[in-house]
């Protein structure tokens, strides 16, 4: 019983770490695109 709980918990942690790294990568891409965008687009 304990081993099954431990395995499921570790699987959830691995999934969270994987999706967290993917999310961070997407956020970095988005912020990079925003900084590269011309400023007049935001001023209009």
Swiss-Prot record:
Propeptide feature: residues: 1-30, 36-44
Knockout consequences: Inactivation of the gene leads to a reduction in sporulation efficiency.
Keywords: Cytoplasm, Secreted, Sporulation
Domain of life: Bacteria
This protein's GO CC annotations: cytoplasm; extracellular region
Family from the record: Belongs to the Phr family.
Name this polypeptide is given: Phosphatase RapE inhibitor
Species name: Bacillus subtilis (strain 168)
Record lineage: Bacteria, Bacillati, Bacillota, Bacilli, Bacillales
């Amino acid at each position: 019983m304990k081993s099954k709980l431990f395995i499921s918990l570790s699987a959830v942690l691995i999934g969270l770490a994987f999706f967290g790294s993917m999310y961070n990568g997407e956020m970095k891409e988005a912020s990079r695109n925003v900084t590269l965008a011309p400023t007049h687009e935001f001023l209009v």
